[in-house]
Regions:
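Active-site neighborhood of phospho(di)ester-bond hydrolases with catalytic His/Asp-centered motifs
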Residues: 26-30, 51-61, 80-83, 189-195, ...
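Active-site environment of divalent metal-dependent phosphoester hydrolases
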Residues: 34, 61-66, 86-89, 106-111, ...
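Binuclear metal-ion centers of metallo-dependent hydrolases, dominated by the metallo-beta-lactamase
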Residues: 78-79, 86-115, 232-311
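Metallo-beta-lactamase
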Residues: 3, 83-178, 184-185, 289, ...
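Active-site-proximal loop/helix segments of hydrolase catalytic cores
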Residues: 160-240
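Short active-site oxyanion
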Residues: 5-7, 73-78, 189
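Pre-active-site segment of Zn-dependent metallo-hydrolases
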Residues: 17-61, 66-73, 96, 129-157, ...
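Residues that mark the start of a beta-strand
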Residues: 7, 23-24, 120, 179, ...
């Protein structure tokens, strides 16, 4: 593992294995399965063998941290998240976990400068996506609900064990929503695994995001309940607030029944939302496709000292 690079490897939904200065962490922790098996070419035990030092939790729904307890049991990783996230994982594990608690109330933030040597981390509490009333006056967007592809299930049928795991974790509590920014040398990466309608429900979060150091790479969830009425309007609020140089969608794969969708089918909507920004403010889009981009660290290997990141 190179200690002079920042490396991220996607393993489904918004979960990444990441290396910062040679220190391995996870952001979210679920290998998608249950509606299929083997679609993502890894499993929780293999992820745990990366020996992560921390698991940064965005929120506690099944599709984000259903494997956290198992990975903690094998690796001893500490949890970074709200107290509710830690409590949920402790309940699943049946024992205490190392917990670095961050604020849960939207708009509150915390600086975590001593977790990873040479890495500064900002944790900002924000809000989950929600159903929205149509906002035709704000860009005249059409609905773009995800269209599930049952072909992936037919080609990769779920094992009884994987299906049972999915069902068992469906009730997992959300426990708050946290956005993280990781800063190494000149490089700043901002990641979040949901997008709420900030303008109406949490304008204080927009102000917090604008005050973060400039974002170079923005990894943002696409799936949102608001798609049913306003397509990716909520996503646009985060992109406008963070003003990144590079944008990469996440949580845009066919991860489960009915609400999953293939990345290729969501791509036109992502490009439309980014295209609504003024031309000078549009980030470059680094689009990824399931299942081809899973476990492809070359897609997200960065030299944090490169001049291109200097503002």
């Amino acid at each position: 593992m190179r200690d002079d690079r920042v490396i991220l490897s996607w393993f489904g939904v918004a979960s990444y294995a990441a290396s910062f200065n040679g220190h391995v962490v996870l952001v979210d922790a679920w290998v998608p399965r249950g509606s299929h098996s083997g679609y993502v070419p890894t499993d929780p035990r293999e992820v745990a063998q990366l020996d992560p030092e921390y698991i940064f939790v965005g929120h506690g729904d099944f599709d984000h941290v259903a494997d956290a307890a198992e990975i903690v049991a094998i690796s001893g990783a500490a949890i970074v998240g709200t107290r509710a996230h830690c409590d949920s994982i402790e309940e699943q594990l049946g024992e205490k976990v190392k917990c670095v608690a961050v604020p849960e109330a939207p708009g509150f933030a915390e600086e975590l400068r001593d977790l990873i040597p040479g890495v500064e981390v900002s944790a900002v509490a924000h809000i989950h996506s929600s159903f929205e009333s149509p906002e035709f006056a704000d860009g005249n967007r059409l609905p773009c609900p995800p269209i599930w592809n049952p072909g992936d299930t037919a080609q990769n049928p779920p094992t009884p064990e994987d299906f049972a795991h999915l069902i068992r974790h469906l009730p997992d509590p959300r426990g708050g929503n946290v956005l993280y920014q990781f800063r190494v040398d000149e490089l700043a990466i901002t990641w979040h695994d949901t997008v709420g309608k900030l303008r109406e429900d949490a304008p204080e979060v927009i102000e917090k995001l604008r005050k973060l150091p400039p974002t170079d790479v923005h990894l943002a969830a696409i799936l949102a309940f608001g798609q049913a009425t306003n397509c990716l309007r909520s996503l646009g609020m985060y992109v406008r607030a963070l003003d990144p140089d590079i944008f990469t969608p996440t949580h845009h794969d066919n991860f489960t029944y009915l609400i999953g969708a293939n990345a290729k089918d969501l791509e036109p909507y992502v490009r439309d939302e980014i295209g609504r920004l003024p031309k000078r403010a549009r980030p470059r889009i680094r689009y990824t496709y399931d299942p081809h981009a899973y476990l492809k660290p070359k897609l997200f290997t960065f030299d944090p000292s490169a001049p291109r990141w200097r503002d």
